[in-house]
Regions:
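Low-complexity, glycine/alanine/valine/leucine- and proline-rich hydrophobic stretches
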Residues: 129-153
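A surface-exposed partner-binding patch
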Residues: 1-127
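Short, intrinsically disordered, charge-balanced linker/junction segments flanking boundaries
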Residues: 153-159
Length: 159
């Protein structure tokens, strides 16, 4: 199953120049095992194999590249670690409101109602503090690794 996800990504990337000839897509070379080890040590989590397979194909994109995800930069493993560290620092310093004040979208019962969790791993960035994240801390109704849209200045989290 994980290889299928990586293959689908490759096929989608191959279509971009045909569908958007003006887009300049600059993808990074695939990640190494050392890249995975460094990130996993930093975030205290083991990445699932399907995510690793995707990052073995492309380790995110250049900051100068056209966005692969609508309006957001696809982060390399190193940039994931950097972004996660910023959020973890804010979390550790108590900058987030009481967890009970966080909320997810009404249709996103699968997401814990938190302002932020150290187990939300950002893999995109829009330049304004908003991310798509892998959610490794879902509610009982959610799935580990589900993708959530995190807004830095709003308690609304979308699945």
């Amino acid at each position: 199953m994980s290889l299928a996800l990586a293959q689908r990504l490759q096929k989608a990337i191959q279509k971009i120049p045909k569908q958007h000839p003006d887009a300049i897509l600059q993808l990074n070379e695939g990640a190494s095992e050392a890249d995975f080890s460094a990130l996993e040590a930093a975030i205290w989590l083991q990445l699932p194999e399907d995510i690793k397979e995707v990052y073995r194909v492309c380790n995110g994109q250049s900051e100068d590249s056209a966005f692969l995800f609508a309006g957001q930069e696809w982060l390399s493993l190193a940039r994931i670690g950097e972004e996660w560290s910023v959020w973890k620092g804010l979390y550790d310093s108590g900058d987030f409101p009481n967890e009970e004040e966080g909320q997810s979208a009404p249709d996103a019962a699968a997401v814990r109602p938190l302002w932020w969790s150290p187990k939300w791993i950002p893999f995109t960035h829009d330049g304004a503090g908003n991310h798509l994240c892998w959610d490794f801390d879902p509610s009982d109704e959610g799935n580990t690794g589900q993708v959530i849209h995190y807004y830095h200045d709003d308690a609304l989290i979308e699945l």
